[in-house]
Protein backbone atom coordinates (compact mmCIF):
# COMPACT_ATOMS: atom_id res chain seq x y z
CA UNK A 1 0.00 0.00 0.00
CA UNK A 2 1.29 3.44 -0.91
CA UNK A 3 1.69 6.14 1.65
CA UNK A 4 -0.12 9.49 1.14
CA UNK A 5 3.09 11.24 0.01
CA UNK A 6 3.57 8.73 -2.84
CA UNK A 7 -0.04 9.13 -3.94
CA UNK A 8 0.26 12.94 -4.00
CA UNK A 9 3.56 12.71 -5.89
CA UNK A 10 2.05 10.39 -8.52
CA UNK A 11 -1.01 12.62 -8.86
CA UNK A 12 1.27 15.65 -9.39
CA UNK A 13 3.30 13.72 -12.01
CA UNK A 14 0.13 12.78 -13.91
CA UNK A 15 -1.08 16.40 -13.84
CA UNK A 16 2.34 17.60 -15.00
CA UNK A 17 2.41 15.14 -17.91
CA UNK A 18 -1.17 16.06 -18.81
CA UNK A 19 -0.26 19.77 -18.84
CA UNK A 20 2.80 19.06 -21.04
CA UNK A 21 0.63 17.11 -23.49
CA UNK A 22 -1.83 19.99 -23.60
CA UNK A 23 0.92 22.53 -24.28
CA UNK A 24 2.33 20.29 -27.04
CA UNK A 25 -1.15 19.89 -28.55
CA UNK A 26 -1.74 23.64 -28.52
CA UNK A 27 1.70 24.24 -30.05
CA UNK A 28 1.09 21.78 -32.87
CA UNK A 29 -2.33 23.28 -33.56
CA UNK A 30 -0.88 26.80 -33.66
CA UNK A 31 1.89 25.58 -35.99
CA UNK A 32 -0.73 24.95 -38.67
CA UNK A 33 -0.98 28.71 -39.19
CA UNK A 34 2.45 28.72 -40.84
CA UNK A 35 0.87 27.07 -43.90
CA UNK A 36 -1.70 29.84 -44.15
CA UNK A 37 0.83 32.48 -45.17
CA UNK A 38 1.95 30.27 -48.05
CA UNK A 39 -1.66 29.86 -49.21
CA UNK A 40 -2.26 33.62 -48.89
CA UNK A 41 0.85 34.39 -50.98
CA UNK A 42 -0.31 31.94 -53.64
CA UNK A 43 -3.74 33.63 -53.69
CA UNK A 44 -2.18 37.10 -53.85
CA UNK A 45 0.05 36.06 -56.76
CA UNK A 46 -2.82 34.44 -58.69
CA UNK A 47 -1.39 30.93 -58.34
CA UNK A 48 -3.39 27.75 -57.61
CA UNK A 49 -4.21 27.24 -53.94
CA UNK A 50 -6.06 23.91 -54.10
CA UNK A 51 -3.24 21.53 -53.08
CA UNK A 52 -1.98 23.75 -50.25
CA UNK A 53 -5.52 24.36 -49.00
CA UNK A 54 -6.25 20.62 -49.10
CA UNK A 55 -3.08 19.94 -47.07
CA UNK A 56 -4.13 22.57 -44.52
CA UNK A 57 -7.59 21.00 -44.19
CA UNK A 58 -6.15 17.49 -43.80
CA UNK A 59 -3.85 18.81 -41.05
CA UNK A 60 -6.85 20.46 -39.38
CA UNK A 61 -8.86 17.24 -39.35
CA UNK A 62 -5.83 15.16 -38.32
CA UNK A 63 -4.90 17.32 -35.37
CA UNK A 64 -8.50 17.18 -34.18
CA UNK A 65 -8.44 13.38 -34.33
CA UNK A 66 -4.96 12.81 -32.91
CA UNK A 67 -4.33 15.54 -30.35
CA UNK A 68 -5.94 15.89 -26.93
CA UNK A 69 -9.28 17.68 -27.16
CA UNK A 70 -8.82 20.07 -24.25
CA UNK A 71 -10.66 23.38 -23.98
CA UNK A 72 -7.45 25.36 -24.58
CA UNK A 73 -6.64 23.36 -27.72
CA UNK A 74 -10.23 23.79 -28.99
CA UNK A 75 -9.99 27.56 -28.56
CA UNK A 76 -6.58 27.58 -30.28
CA UNK A 77 -7.99 25.48 -33.13
CA UNK A 78 -10.87 27.91 -33.59
CA UNK A 79 -8.55 30.90 -33.60
CA UNK A 80 -6.20 29.28 -36.14
CA UNK A 81 -9.11 28.27 -38.39
CA UNK A 82 -10.69 31.72 -38.27
CA UNK A 83 -7.37 33.48 -38.83
CA UNK A 84 -6.74 31.21 -41.83
CA UNK A 85 -10.09 32.07 -43.40
CA UNK A 86 -9.61 35.79 -42.79
CA UNK A 87 -6.06 35.84 -44.17
CA UNK A 88 -6.74 33.87 -47.35
CA UNK A 89 -10.08 35.52 -48.08
CA UNK A 90 -8.52 38.95 -47.62
CA UNK A 91 -6.02 38.23 -50.39
CA UNK A 92 -8.69 36.72 -52.63
CA UNK A 93 -11.00 39.70 -52.11
CA UNK A 94 -8.25 42.12 -53.09
CA UNK A 95 -7.44 40.24 -56.28
CA UNK A 96 -10.95 39.10 -57.32
CA UNK A 97 -13.67 41.73 -56.67
CA UNK A 98 -16.39 39.31 -57.79
CA UNK A 99 -15.59 37.17 -54.73
CA UNK A 100 -16.28 39.94 -52.22
CA UNK A 101 -20.03 39.34 -51.77
CA UNK A 102 -19.48 35.64 -51.06
CA UNK A 103 -16.56 36.45 -48.78
CA UNK A 104 -18.70 38.96 -46.85
CA UNK A 105 -21.49 36.39 -46.38
CA UNK A 106 -19.02 33.74 -45.21
CA UNK A 107 -17.44 36.28 -42.86
CA UNK A 108 -20.83 37.10 -41.32
CA UNK A 109 -21.42 33.40 -40.71
CA UNK A 110 -17.97 33.04 -39.14
CA UNK A 111 -18.65 36.03 -36.87
CA UNK A 112 -22.06 34.66 -35.82
CA UNK A 113 -20.62 31.22 -35.10
CA UNK A 114 -17.68 32.69 -33.21
CA UNK A 115 -19.94 34.97 -31.17
CA UNK A 116 -22.28 32.08 -30.30
CA UNK A 117 -19.38 29.88 -29.25
CA UNK A 118 -17.77 32.70 -27.23
CA UNK A 119 -21.07 33.39 -25.47
CA UNK A 120 -21.46 29.70 -24.65
CA UNK A 121 -17.89 29.58 -23.32
CA UNK A 122 -18.45 32.67 -21.16
CA UNK A 123 -21.72 31.33 -19.71
CA UNK A 124 -20.74 27.69 -19.18
CA UNK A 125 -16.93 27.42 -19.40
CA UNK A 126 -17.49 24.87 -22.18
CA UNK A 127 -15.86 25.18 -25.60
CA UNK A 128 -17.70 24.06 -28.73
CA UNK A 129 -16.62 21.52 -31.32
CA UNK A 130 -18.66 22.12 -34.47
CA UNK A 131 -18.21 18.62 -35.89
CA UNK A 132 -19.89 17.95 -39.22
CA UNK A 133 -21.50 21.40 -39.31
CA UNK A 134 -18.22 23.25 -39.05
CA UNK A 135 -16.63 20.78 -41.48
CA UNK A 136 -19.35 21.51 -44.07
CA UNK A 137 -18.87 25.27 -43.64
CA UNK A 138 -15.09 24.89 -43.97
CA UNK A 139 -15.42 22.79 -47.13
CA UNK A 140 -17.84 25.30 -48.69
CA UNK A 141 -15.50 28.16 -47.78
CA UNK A 142 -12.52 26.30 -49.24
CA UNK A 143 -14.53 25.61 -52.40
CA UNK A 144 -15.21 29.34 -52.73
CA UNK A 145 -11.51 30.11 -52.24
CA UNK A 146 -10.35 27.58 -54.82
CA UNK A 147 -12.91 28.66 -57.42
CA UNK A 148 -12.20 32.37 -56.84
CA UNK A 149 -8.47 31.74 -57.25
CA UNK A 150 -9.15 30.35 -60.73
CA UNK A 151 -10.40 33.76 -61.83
CA UNK A 152 -13.77 32.91 -63.39
CA UNK A 153 -16.20 35.65 -62.22
CA UNK A 154 -19.43 33.74 -62.99
CA UNK A 155 -18.31 30.59 -61.19
CA UNK A 156 -16.95 32.66 -58.32
CA UNK A 157 -20.31 34.38 -57.78
CA UNK A 158 -22.10 31.01 -57.88
CA UNK A 159 -19.60 29.48 -55.44
CA UNK A 160 -20.07 32.52 -53.19
CA UNK A 161 -23.85 31.97 -53.12
CA UNK A 162 -23.42 28.28 -52.34
CA UNK A 163 -20.83 28.93 -49.63
CA UNK A 164 -23.03 31.62 -48.07
CA UNK A 165 -25.99 29.23 -47.96
CA UNK A 166 -23.97 26.41 -46.43
CA UNK A 167 -22.38 28.69 -43.84
CA UNK A 168 -25.79 30.16 -42.92
CA UNK A 169 -27.34 26.70 -42.57
CA UNK A 170 -24.46 25.40 -40.46
CA UNK A 171 -24.46 28.44 -38.17
CA UNK A 172 -27.94 27.56 -36.84
CA UNK A 173 -26.80 24.46 -34.86
CA UNK A 174 -24.28 26.62 -32.99
CA UNK A 175 -27.21 28.65 -31.67
CA UNK A 176 -29.11 25.64 -30.30
CA UNK A 177 -28.55 25.07 -26.61
CA UNK A 178 -26.32 28.10 -26.37
CA UNK A 179 -25.58 29.08 -22.79
CA UNK A 180 -26.98 25.82 -21.40
CA UNK A 181 -24.34 23.61 -19.75
CA UNK A 182 -23.88 20.11 -21.15
CA UNK A 183 -21.89 18.94 -18.14
CA UNK A 184 -18.79 18.39 -20.26
CA UNK A 185 -15.75 20.54 -21.01
CA UNK A 186 -16.41 20.35 -24.76
CA UNK A 187 -19.87 20.88 -26.26
CA UNK A 188 -20.10 18.71 -29.38
CA UNK A 189 -22.56 19.58 -32.15
Per-region residue spans from a language model:
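Acidic (Asp/Glu-rich) catalytic motifs at the cytosolic membrane interface
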Residues: 48-89, 110-118
Amino acid sequence: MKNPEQKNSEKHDVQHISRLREVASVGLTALRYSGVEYIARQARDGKPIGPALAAFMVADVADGQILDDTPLRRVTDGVVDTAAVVRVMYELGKRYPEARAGIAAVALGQVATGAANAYHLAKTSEVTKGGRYKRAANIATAMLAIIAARGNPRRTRLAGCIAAGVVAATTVPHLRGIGKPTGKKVRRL
